[in-house]
Amino acid sequence: MDPVSVVHSFARSQGLPLNFETVGCEGPSHDPRFVIECKFLDFQHQCTDSSKKRAIQKICVLISNDLKENGLLEEAKTFKPEYKSIAQVYGKFFKRYIAEKESSVITPFKLVNNQILLHDIDELVEYGSSEYMFRHMLLCYIIHKQGIDIKEMCNMKFSPDYIECLSHHLTSTVDIDVHQQDCGNLSVVIFAKDNNIKKQLQIQVSA
């Protein structure tokens, strides 16, 4: 397949949004050159051409190369439609939660390997709320990122594909940096890709 088809096919198989944005226009009005930008997963590229279509083609070549270099094309899989639907809805409310949160630091959260979301001690979180979606999606990302083994709970278990699907979708929605601290905590910095909102969370990891 050509690079454009490769990138679009990969995005569809992973349930990830793929958007090309015109961020500028250079040159005289009679001969403009369009500046097109695309942020996809952890990749960000910008190309300029007199044709928007050709600029997008150039970006797809770069993204296709990124996917190959990172071994993602070989590992690409098709997630269940229900997983992708959940990821899309949760991702939307994840970004909304960040935008509405006044504090830039949220602490502490605990990561317990038989729970379904990050939580505070003795804290009740309403199922289906934006708070729940935020914590659950972030938990799936951390589980996938850190390679944490999850135990079964109340006759329920996490599907590895489900966790991977939500994790991949989240990285297409926001930028996340995770650092292991000497004390055992995870320092998580979340940056929304479409604005200047930045949040830092200190998360206590416990088995």
UniProtKB/Swiss-Prot annotation:
Keywords: RNA-binding. SMART domains: DSRM (SM00358). Pfam families: dsrm (PF00035). The keyword RNA-binding applies. GO terms for molecular function: RNA binding. It comes from Banna virus (BAV). Residues 2-69 form the DRBM domain. This is Non-structural protein 5.
